[in-house]
Regions:
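CN hydrolase (nitrilase-like) catalytic-core segments centered on the catalytic cysteine
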Residues: 76-99, 157, 163-222
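Metal-dependent catalytic neighborhoods of phosphoester/phosphodiester hydrolases
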Residues: 49-69, 110
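Short hydrophobic alpha-helix segments
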Residues: 120, 126-127
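Residue-level recognition of short loop/turn positions
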Residues: 120-121, 155
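A short, polar/charged loop-to-alpha-helix boundary motif
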Residues: 128-143
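Active-site-proximal beta-strand elements of phosphoester/diester hydrolases
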Residues: 6-18, 113, 126, 150, ...
């Protein structure tokens, strides 16, 4: 899209329902409904919001986190599946673009996955975080570059990256070459204090400036 237009976007900076995928899903659907009442056309949720970001990996050693790993695996999202079907239906109902981060379960592995649903409820993009960050490698498998794409929606050309992928110049460049107009940045909540927020703001401002696109940044709330 090259014509001038006004888009109303929302960053859903909310907390999940820990250890309860259905509870977090209902929170997602309720938030979409609330955003629709306010005229929102695109909404972005935080990194791996469904069922929840693995905060346990920040504070417990892997060998002591077996139960937490199994709980996350059991609640992880199958794509496509009942959870994605429910989100797609709500996106279609409101004519809204929905960008959702999930823990995706596939063939025995959990992935950090970003989903983009268009205004018709179609799943336009499923991409996996290419290289999980530091402690995350004990939780998620590696993705690949096949998801570094920008998709056409009613609000324009939309792309997404997760957290520390914004420090990967080639990942950002891949989206720039596809003429990204709206960038969806997803981050978890932080246990390390204000330095995380400061770094986050620098990197998303940098991407907006360098790419010439708008950035919607959604960060989890602890």
């Amino acid at each position: 899209m090259s014509q001038a237009r006004i888009i109303k976007a929302a960053a859903a900076q909310i907390s999940p329902v820990l250890n309860e995928a259905e509870g977090t899903l209902h929170k997602v659907l309720d938030t979409i409904d609330q955003a629709a009442r306010q005229g929102v056309q695109i909404i972005v949720f935080p990194e791996t919001f469904v069922p929840y970001y693995p905060y346990f990996s920040f504070i417990r050693p892997p060998m002591a986190s077996g139960a937490e790993h199994m709980a996350l695996y059991e609640h992880a999202v199958v794509v496509p599946g009942p959870i994605t079907d429910a989100v797609a239906q709500r996106a279609r109902q409101h004519g809204m673009v929905v960008v959702l981060g999930v823990n995706e379960r596939d063939h025995g592995t959990i992935y950090n996955t970003q989903l983009i649903f268009d205004e018709n409820g179609a799943l336009l993009l499923k991409r996996r975080k290419i290289t999980p960050t530091f402690h995350e490698r004990m939780v998620w498998g590696q993705g690949d570059g096949s998801g570094l794409k920008v998709v056409d929606t009613r609000v324009g050309r939309v792309g997404a990256l997760a957290c520390w992928e914004h420090y990967n110049p080639l990942a950002r460049y891949a989206l720039m070459t596809e003429h990204e107009e709206i960038h969806c940045a997803q981050f978890p909540g932080s246990l390390v204090g204000p330095i995380f927020a400061e770094q986050m703001e620098v990197t998303i401002r940098h991407h907006a400036l360098e790419s010439g696109c708008f950035v919607v940044n959604a960060t989890g709330w602890l």
